[in-house]
Amino acid sequence: TANYAFSSVETVDLADNALTGTANADTFDVTGANALTSAGINFSNVEVVNADDGADQVNTDGADVSLFAELGNAVDYALETLGITFRETENADLNGGTLAGSSEADSFEVNGAALTANAISVTNAASGINAGDGVDVLTVNDTNSTLTGIDNELDTANYAFSSVETVDLADNALTGTANADTFDVTGANALTSADIDFTNVASVDANDGDDQVNTNGATLTSEAGIAVDNALTTQQIAFTSVENLDLANGALAGSDAADSFEVNGVALTANAISVTKAASGINAGDGVDVLTVNDTNSTLTGADNALDTANYQFTSVETVDLADNALTGTANADTFDVTGANALTSAGINFSN
């Protein structure tokens, strides 16, 4: 105590005061409201514990735990449980109890079941974690995380987080819900979805539903030499299972395999993706690409494999289905090789219908 050194003590009433640990590793077993056991002593009316130095351990025996904040900031190595505020705590075993964030910006990191919260190594926490108020930051080292359909919620391999504002996926994948999700790409490997700002996103499986990607330019993708429907790459993020794409006047480019495009005026579909606000110039890329044009007229440009539709200028196109519409040549000398019924070749393009 302040003036005495007691030994052979079994029970201590701290009268709503504080307890300080040693410079070594201490263990504190919380046994009830404002009660704990440490160093063979049963303490009651404990208000605060400063665990001090060493790799200290707090065991809460299933009690709920909240991270701690003061003066507008989350405090590392600090938590609250059953009326006791712990500081300088390196390890916490919740024995199935719930972990919640503080009123300020907390940091969480997960790798499978391994969980760190405000620098505390947390074990045996319940799977549901409410990150609390503040702009909380979650770093996920799992290979995949999944949206739930509710804003600010994310399921990792072992935990279900809510009230999360910022997530670092550590170059891993994100999966959408079975319903319609929206992904706003904000920069290289970065996007916003479900009101969460994601960074270090390697790939996104938008999953089922009528999903939307908003970005400023995209390239269609292929796998093993075959173009993949509903797939694209933008800002170093590989998207799959995407139904809709808004390019905000950015460019669309084809893959290195045979892509399919269809236009009807400004309406554009590319590898089964409905594309809006694409820049007018579209390079179809490598492969024997197929373009279906529902406009009443399309026009050659004088360059091989190039065709202007009503709203787009395609290059690197090998095959065009004019859907029983018209083709117009250039102001110069063009050659048209008729190859069959309603079929011809011109400017390196095989036209049908």
Regions found by a protein language model. Give the residues of each.
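Low-complexity/repetitive intrinsically disordered segments
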Residues: 1-22, 119-129, 135-139, 165, ...
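Short "repeat-start/strand-capping" segments in structured domains, especially the N-termini
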Residues: 44-46, 112-115, 124, 199-201, ...
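Extracellular beta-solenoid/beta-roll
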Residues: 45, 57, 84, 108, ...
